[in-house]
């Protein structure tokens, strides 16, 4: 199985050459300014990709997932959106989480220490593929 991982495309996803693979993973900052319109274009782009499965998590620029979560999730029809949640595909257990330590005033920021640790403590021990926008400490 071939996993293809991309990140930080900032609405420039149509400008990159994506390698072939079985599962396409976008690990956040998929949007430029975080609008639903940008997200709709991203979902259309996901539909055009040949990968059997697509997985998406939000990053600190992906405001619509934080500010308009129901609307944002409804727009994603061609990928699995993970936010502190699991997904099992073809025998692999994935976990996706968008949280990063506070950095200026971006989306999905939590204070270092117990606040962010509480999110990362949710990650199951049997996770095969961990998808985060920033690396969790100690993993």
Across the structure, where does each feature detected by a protein language model lie?
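Active-site-proximal loop/helix segment associated with metal-binding centers of metalloenzymes
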Residues: 21-23, 56, 92-139
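Core catalytic region of metal-dependent phosphoesterases/phosphodiesterases
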Residues: 6-89
